[in-house]
C-alpha cells in the first residue's frame, strides 16, 4: 500500500511516463526498426548485483533511452513487417493501467465478480461482432458454451486438445472399462495441415497425442479429401482419431483451410474440430470477409488474438467452446479453499484454463471496443488490407519479383525470381540497414519474403519508402551476383536500373553467332549481347575456364560441342537442382562407383570418354562452370531471370 506522499509521486511520474509513451509512439516511424546489438549486449550496462539503496527515479527514467531502447525491436513502427501485427492503442493502455492498479486474481467468481462477469459479457459481444454461432455465447437460451480470455492462441490450442483427449478417453473407457488411460491415450491421433502453426506440434508433445500434418492443395488449404484419407488409414492401423486443428490464416501465407469440407467429416467421425484464426479472426469484423467462416457451425472451439490486429495489446486471446462442460471436466479441481457460496451456480474461470490465477484482461478489451466502436474497427481492418493491396501492386509492377501465393488480408509474400539464394541475399541486405524488418518463409521449396502491414498508422508513403528500400537491396544483389569477378568484356553487362516494361526486359538480350574462324563452323562462338553493346562489352563463358596455353580453336570446338550436347540432354531431364552451388541433376542413372574413383585421372578420362579431347585442357572447376552456363532447362529456349536481364545461365556462377 502506498503512503499518501507516494500518490503524489506516482501522479507526477505517471504523467511523465504518459508523455514519454506519447512521444515514443508518435515518432516511432523515425526510429530504426531493428537494433544494432549482439547477444549479451546488456550485461556490461547493468551492475552484476541489485542496488542496496534505492536509485532515484530520474536515474531509472534516464536508463530507458540509454539501456532499453537501443535493444528494442519497434513492433509499433509502420516499417515493421516481419510478423503478424502486435498492436496497441491508448484505450488498451489505459485499460491495463487500471487493471494493474486493481490487480485482482479472478480465478473464481467470488475472488472478483466484476472480473468474471465483464469477461463473460465482452466475450459475447466479441462473438457477435465476428459472426460466430450462438452456441458460443454465455447468454443464450440454447447455448451450453461460452468464451474466455486466455493468454495465447498456443495455450488455447493445447486446452482444446486436452479437452478433446479427455472426452475421447471417457468414450473409450465406456467400451473398455478395464483399459488403462495411458494405453488409450497412446492410440489417439490428431490432425492439422502441414501449414499449421508450430504450437499445434507443441500441444501434441505436451498431451502425448500423435499429430499428423496433412498435405494441402495448391492454395495451401487443407481439404476434406486429405483428412478423410488419413482418418481411414489410421483407423485401419488401430488408431483413434480425436482432434482436427483447422487454420484460418496460416502463418506462412495466410491460407485458409476448408471448414465446409472438414466440418462434416469431423461431425461424422466424432472428432473435435478446433479453429485457429489467430491473425485472421479480426478480419471477420467485416461481414464481406466471413466467407472463410463457412462451416464454422461444425466447430467445437474457436480462438483468435485481439492482441494481433484489433489494437488490444498482448496478452489477450479469445477462446470459445461449444460445450463448456467438456472443458470443465478436463481442468476441474476443487479444493475447499477455492469453494464459495455460489460454487456450481456462478462461472469459475479457473476450470476453463491451465493456470489457477488470471488477470483482469477484459477491461482493456472493453475500453477498446467502446472507444472505437464496431464501425471504426471495421475501417481499421479495411485500411490494413488496402495497404497490402497497394504493396502487392508495386511488387507485381516489377518484373524481377514474383508473388508465389495469393494475397490474403494484410499479408503479401514475394520473392526475387530465380534461385533461393537471391532472395536470401536480398533479405540479408535489407537486414543490414535496420530500416525495415522482414522475415523469410518457405513454400514448395521456394524461399519467400513475408510482408505484413501491421501499424494502424501505415500510409502509402510508408509502403512506398519500404518498397524502394527492397528494390535497392534487390538491385544491389543482382548487380553483385551478375558481375561477380567480371571479365573486362562483362564490365558493362548490368546497366543502372531503368524503367522499362516487361516486354523490353524480356527481349533486352540477344543470342548471336560470332564467327572468328572464317568458314569453320566449330569456330562459331555463342555470346550474349545487350542492344547497343559492342563486342568488348559482351559476356564470354569461357573466360578463366582454360589454361593460357589453350588456343581459341580449342575453346570454340568445346563451345560448339557443349551447345549441341546439352541442348539435347536438357530436354531429357525430369529434375534439376535449384541450388546455385550444385551440379544440375540428371534423370539418367549415375554409373556405379568403383575402384577407379580412387584414381582421379583414370576416372576423369572414363567420364570424359565421350567428350572432345579438348576437355582435358580445362582448369579445375572450368567444366563445372561451363556445364552450369549451358544447363538451364531446354537451353536456349528457356532462361533464368537475372536482374533486369534475361540470361540463359545460373546468375551466381555462370559468369566468370
UniProtKB/Swiss-Prot annotation:
Residues 481-502 are annotated as: Disordered. Belongs to the group II decarboxylase family. The modification N6-(pyridoxal phosphate)lysine is found at residue 308. It catalyses: L-histidine + H(+) = histamine + CO2. Phosphorylation of brain HDC by cAMP-dependent protein kinase leads to enzyme inactivation. A putative trans-splicing which involves HDC and SHBG gene regions produces a fusion protein expressed in fetal liver. Pathway: Amine and polyamine biosynthesis; histamine biosynthesis; histamine from L-histidine: step 1/1. Substrate binds at residues 84, 197. The keyword Hydrolase does not apply. It comes from Rattus norvegicus (Rat). Catalyzes the biosynthesis of histamine from histidine. Brain, glandular regions of the stomach, mast cells and fetal liver. GO terms for biological process: catecholamine biosynthetic process; histamine biosynthetic process; histamine metabolic process; L-histidine catabolic process; L-histidine metabolic process. This is Histidine decarboxylase. Its EC number is 4.1.1.22. The modification Phosphoserine is found at residues 343, 362. SUPFAM superfamilies: PLP-dependent transferases (SSF53383). Homodimer. PANTHER family: GROUP II PYRIDOXAL-5-PHOSPHATE DECARBOXYLASE, HISTIDINE DECARBOXYLASE. GO terms for cellular component: cytoplasm; dendrite; neuronal cell body. Gene3D superfamilies: Aspartate Aminotransferase, domain 1, dopa decarboxylase, N-terminal domain, Type I PLP-dependent aspartate aminotransferase-like (Major domain). GO terms for molecular function: amino acid binding; histidine decarboxylase activity; identical protein binding; pyridoxal phosphate binding.
Amino acid at each position: 500500500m502506498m503512503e499518501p506522499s507516494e500518490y503524489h509521486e506516482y501522479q507526477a511520474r505517471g504523467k511523465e511516463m504518459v508523455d514519454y509513451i506519447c512521444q515514443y509512439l508518435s515518432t516511432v516511424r523515425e526510429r530504426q526498426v531493428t537494433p544494432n546489438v549482439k547477444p549479451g549486449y546488456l550485461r556490461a550496462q547493468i551492475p552484476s548485483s541489485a542496488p542496496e539503496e534505492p536509485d532515484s527515479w530520474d536515474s531509472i527514467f534516464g536508463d530507458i533511452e540509454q539501456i532499453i531502447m537501443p535493444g528494442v525491436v519497434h513492433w509499433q513502427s509502420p516499417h515493421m513487417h516481419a510478423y503478424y501485427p502486435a498492436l496497441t492503442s491508448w484505450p488498451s493502455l489505459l485499460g491495463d493501467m487500471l487493471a494493474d492498479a486493481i490487480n485482482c486474481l479472478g480465478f473464481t467468481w467470488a475472488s472478483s465478480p466484476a472480473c468474471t462477469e465483464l469477461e463473460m459479457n465482452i466475450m459475447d459481444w466479441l462473438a457477435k461482432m465476428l459472426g460466430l454461432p450462438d452456441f458460443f455465447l454465455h447468454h443464450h437460451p440454447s447455448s451450453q458454451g461460452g468464451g474466455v480470455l486466455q493468454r495465447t492462441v498456443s495455450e488455447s490450442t493445447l486446452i482444446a486438445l486436452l479437452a478433446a483427449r479427455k472426452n475421447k478417453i471417457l468414450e473409450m473407457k465406456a467400451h473398455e472399462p478395464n483399459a488403462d488411460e495411458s494405453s488409450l491415450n497412446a492410440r489417439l491421433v490428431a490432425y492439422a495441415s502441414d501449414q499449421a502453426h508450430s504450437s499445434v506440434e507443441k500441444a501434441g508433445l505436451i498431451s502425448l497425442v500423435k499429430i499428423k500434418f496433412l498435405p494441402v492443395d495448391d492454395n495451401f488449404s487443407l481439404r476434406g479429401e486429405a483428412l478423410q484419407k488419413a482418418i481411414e488409414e489410421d483407423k485401419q492401423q488401430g488408431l483413434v482419431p480425436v482432434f482436427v486443428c483447422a487454420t484460418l490464416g496460416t502463418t506462412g501465407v495466410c491460407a485458409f483451410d476448408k471448414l465446409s469440407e472438414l466440418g462434416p467429416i469431423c461431425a461424422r467421425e466424432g472428432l473435435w474440430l478446433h479453429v485457429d484464426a489467430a491473425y485472421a479472426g479480426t478480419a471477420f469484423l467485416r461481414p464481406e470477409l466471413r466467407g472463410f467462416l463457412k462451416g464454422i457451425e461444425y466447430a467445437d472451439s474457436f480462438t483468435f488474438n485481439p492482441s494481433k490486429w484489433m489494437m488490444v495489446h498482448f496478452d489477450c486471446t479469445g477462446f470459445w467452446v461449444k460445450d463448456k462442460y467438456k472443458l470443465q471436466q478436463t481442468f476441474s479441481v476443487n479444493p475447499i479453499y477455492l469453494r464459495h457460496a455460489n460454487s456450481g451456480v456462478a462461472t469459475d474461470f479457473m476450470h476453463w484454463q491451465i493456470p489457477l490465477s488470471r488477470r483482469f484482461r477484459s477491461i482493456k478489451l472493453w475500453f477498446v471496443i467502446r472507444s472505437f466502436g464496431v464501425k471504426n474497427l471495421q475501417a481499421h481492418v479495411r485500411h490494413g488490407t488496402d495497404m497490402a493491396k497497394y504493396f502487392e501492386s508495386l511488387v507485381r509492377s516489377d518484373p524481377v519479383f514474383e508473388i508465389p501465393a495469393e494475397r490474403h488480408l494484410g499479408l503479401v509474400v514475394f520473392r526475387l525470381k530465380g534461385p533461393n539464394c537471391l532472395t536470401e541475399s536480398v533479405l540479408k541486405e535489407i537486414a543490414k540497414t535496420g530500416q525495415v524488418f522482414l522475415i523469410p518463409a518457405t513454400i514448395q521449396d521456394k524461399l519467400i519474403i513475408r510482408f505484413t502491414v501491421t501499424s494502424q498508422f501505415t500510409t502509402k508513403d510508408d509502403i512506398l519508402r519500404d518498397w524502394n528500400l527492397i528494390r535497392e537491396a534487390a538491385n544491389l544483389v543482382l548487380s553483385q551476383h551478375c558481375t561477380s569477378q567480371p571479365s573486362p568484356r562483362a564490365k558493362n553487362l548490368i546497366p543502372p536500373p531503368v524503367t522499362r516494361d516487361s516486354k523490353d526486359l524480356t527481349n533486352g538480350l540477344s543470342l548471336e553467332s560470332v564467327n572468328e574462324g572464317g568458314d569453320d563452323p566449330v569456330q562459331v562462338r555463342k555470346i550474349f549481347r545487350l542492344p547497343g553493346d559492342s563486342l568488348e562489352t559482351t559476356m564470354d563463358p569461357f573466360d578463366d575456364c582454360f589454361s593460357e596455353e589453350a588456343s581459341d580453336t580449342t575453346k570454340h570446338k568445346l563451345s560448339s560441342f557443349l551447345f549441341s550436347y546439352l541442348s539435347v540432354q536438357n530436354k531429357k531431364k525430369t529434375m534439376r537442382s535449384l541450388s546455385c552451388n550444385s551440379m544440375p541433376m540428371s534423370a539418367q542413372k549415375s554409373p556405379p562407383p568403383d575402384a577407379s574413383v580412387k584414381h582421379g585421372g583414370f576416372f576423369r578420362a572414363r567420364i570424359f570418354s565421350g567428350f572432345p579431347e579438348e576437355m582435358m585442357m580445362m582448369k579445375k572447376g572450368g567444366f563445372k562452370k561451363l556445364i552450369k552456363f549451358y544447363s538451364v532447362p531446354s537451353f536456349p529456349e528457356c532462361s533464368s531471370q537475372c536482374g533486369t536481364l534475361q540470361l540463359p545461365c545460373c546468375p551466381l556462377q555462370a559468369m566468370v
